[in-house]
Regions:
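Disulfide-rich extracellular modules and peptides
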Residues: 24, 116, 248-251, 264, ...
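Extracellular secreted precursors and ectodomains with disulfide-bonded cysteine-rich loops/domains
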Residues: 20-22, 59, 112, 244-247, ...
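Generic detector of contiguous secondary-structure segments
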Residues: 215-222, 266-275
């Protein structure tokens, strides 16, 4: 009978003998449970034999699954640490996880930070599923790696011209890590990325992290539209400003918009005032949906020169499908008129 039992154990545990560790976990777990139903005297040394192979297989399987999913290896490592906490394989869990985290943290500074941060996110989830006392410090290390990686990924996407993805990544970074010293710069890059998605010239370089010295020129933006407007701008400085709806303002025809908008004497148009250093700027006028969900956003570029005060007017053009498209407004502003391009949107 013992010889037949040995043959049985060998047959059931064959995946372990073949080093197919993930496939070996279930049959080894079954063999380990047999002393609960079979006389231990009959089993002899076989009663304790599955412990070592099962611990080894749980470890090897967990390692093979690291990085392969949102919590790769967590189930195997968790079972190992709970069932065989003093085993040699259990003592290897923290070192191997630490080594993997360190490797991905280093990759954040490389050519593909986005791939590195996704791997770090999976490692962080794996660590979070394990007993903290058995993987000390690794949750903090992985979390810091994800934080650095999210920022690096957003910057990388901006520099690669993937502006919509850059905006999403850096908006998330700024919301998640409000106390991070890079949050303000992340918001600036996200603004520039949103503008660049409509006007690629705005994405040729990252926004400056600091504010330039020297004189500032005033830009007064008026809203002659029945819907609110958010104005995004980037250049020597980057930011946003929101204008309230003009309650009694109407849409213009294509023929009258550029000559009549913001021209009613004494009318109190909603206004915003910006103080801008000289330089080239890119603007995105985002019309709200209060008046019509079909109002388009509009992007433009202008140059701010020293010694001038500038104005800009935003308005909405009513356009039928039979009317021709409006021409693109000029990119460069000649300061003789002291006025930025008038930002009209059509619907």
């Amino acid at each position: 009978m013992p010889e037949r039992l040995k043959d049985y154990y060998d047959a059931v545990s064959s995946p372990y003998a073949d080093k197919r560790h993930c496939q070996a976990v279930e049959p080894l777990t079954y063999l380990r449970s047999l002393p609960g139903t079979v006389d231990r005297k009959l089993l002899g040394e076989l009663a304790e034999w599955p412990d070592g192979p099962l611990a080894e297989s749980l470890y090897a399987c967990g390692v093979s699954r690291l990085g392969g999913g949102s919590s790769g290896g967590a189930a195997e490592f968790g079972e190992l640490l709970r069932t065989f906490p003093e085993s040699a394989p259990a003592r290897q869990v923290a070192p191997v996880l630490g080594e993997r985290i360190d490797g991905r943290v280093a990759e954040v500074k490389g050519d593909d930070p986005c791939a590195a941060v996704e791997a770090l996110r999976g490692l962080r989830t794996t660590v979070a599923a394990l007993p903290a006392q058995q993987v000390p410090g690794l949750s903090t290390k992985a979390g810091k790696g994800v934080q650095d990686g999210d920022y690096a990924c957003g910057v990388d996407r901006f520099e690669e011209g993937k502006f919509s993805q850059a905006k999403l990544t850096l908006d998330r970074f700024a919301r998640t890590y409000r106390s991070d010293g890079r949050a303000a710069q992340a918001r600036k890059i996200a603004i520039a990325a949103e503008i660049a998605a409509a006007r690629p010239a705005a994405g040729k370089r990252l926004p400056p992290s600091g504010n330039p010295g020297g004189p500032r020129m005033e830009l007064v933006i008026s809203n002659d539209a029945p819907n609110g407007v958010e104005v995004l701008y980037t250049g020597p400085v980057t930011g946003t400003v929101t204008l309230k709806p003009c309650g009694d303002c109407k849409r213009y025809s294509a023929a009258t918009g550029s000559t009549r908008a913001c021209k009613v004497s004494g009318k109190n148009y909603p206004k915003a005032r910006l103080q801008l250093p000289a330089g080239d700027y890119h603007f995105l006028y985002k019309h709200g949906t209060g008046a019509s969900s079909r109002v388009d956003s509009y992007a433009a570029g202008s140059k701010v020169r020293p010694g001038y005060t500038y104005t800009s007017c935003t308005y909405v053009i009513e356009r039928s499908l039979l009317e021709p498209r409006l021409p693109t407004l000029p990119d460069l502003l000649e300061p003789t008129s002291l006025s930025l391009p008038r930002a009209g949107s059509s619907r």
